[in-house]
């Protein structure tokens, strides 16, 4: 019975660890968006609204590299971009 109880508790901790991982994954997604935004704001990255997309109206994460007619999200700390938004 001890072995069964040990397996059962192990299985339960794996389940709770899996749900922790899911919420950590969501947090990571938010962090990576912030990092992508910082890179775009520094002018070292290419946003999704750059010339590579053919001038689509997305403007990228920060709107820092998009064409003038883009209406993407802009970050409040970005400089030199055309995306008019205030957040990534």
From Swiss-Prot:
Residues 1-24 have a biased composition (Low complexity). Residues 56-66 have a biased composition (Gly residues). One of its GO terms (biological process) is sorocarp development. It comes from the Eukaryota. Disulfide bonds: none annotated. It holds the Pfam family Coiled. Residues 1-25, 45-88 are annotated as: Disordered. Belongs to the hssA/B family. This is HssA/B-like protein 64. It comes from Dictyostelium discoideum.
